[in-house]
């Protein structure tokens, strides 16, 4: 099987995924805790099919599965699986997410949009090591949902 290369980069997928409302509900014992999590699950299943992943399916618990066969001649080597969750924490709103993209971060405090919130160097001293890089944050009005949609985007 010849796989097609994904045309989107991981950060582009992340920006798409964080906009899908997948906030969980703590009081629910069902898996998933909300049916809206299937919105992202179905989107992921379609994307996997488009890039040539085999046996793509989504089950009644919203787990998305797919198979990428071993490279010819390496079929006897150990297999690997990747796991990431799609739901986001109910601690703060995850609906109508507006990511804030900061190209060439200047190394200082990061104001989160027009909100009262900021990522300060006092609270997050490691930020200085990201100077010059592109940061993706929330605008402060919602959670970003990068836990674990960033993992989903990478996979």
Name each model-derived stretch:
Residues 2, 32-33, 143-147:
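A generic structural signal for short
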Residues 13-16, 43-46, 154:
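Alpha-helical scaffold segments in soluble metabolic enzymes
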Residues 29-77, 81-83, 87:
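A non-catalytic alpha/beta surface segment that caps or lines the substrate-entry region
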Residues 1-7:
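Short, Lys/Arg-enriched N-terminal segments with co-localized hydrophobic residues
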Residues 7-35, 137:
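N-terminal capping segment at the start of a domain
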Residues 74-154:
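Active-site metal-coordination/substrate-binding segment of hydrolases
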Residues 8, 35-38, 42, 149-152:
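Electropositive phosphate-/nucleotide-binding environments in soluble metabolic enzymes
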Residues 18, 22-25, 48, 52, ...:
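Structural signal for hydrophobic packing residues in well-ordered secondary-structure cores
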């Amino acid at each position: 099987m010849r796989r097609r290369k994904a045309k989107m980069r991981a950060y582009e997928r992340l920006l798409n995924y964080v906009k899908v409302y997948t906030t969980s509900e703590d009081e629910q014992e069902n898996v998933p805790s909300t049916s809206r999590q299937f919105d992202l699950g179905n989107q992921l299943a379609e994307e996997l099919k488009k890039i040539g992943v085999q046996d793509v399916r989504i089950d009644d618990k919203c787990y998305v599965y797919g198979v990428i066969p071993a490279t010819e001649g390496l079929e006897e080597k150990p297999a690997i699986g990747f796991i990431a969750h799609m739901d986001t924490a109910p601690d703060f709103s995850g609906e109508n997410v507006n990511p804030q993209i900061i190209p060439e971060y200047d190394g200082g405090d990061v104001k989160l949009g027009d909100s009262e919130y900021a990522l300060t160097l006092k609270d997050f001293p490691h930020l200085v090591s990201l100077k010059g890089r592109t940061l993706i944050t929330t605008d402060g009005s919602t959670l970003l949902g990068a836990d674990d949609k960033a993992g989903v985007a990478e996979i």
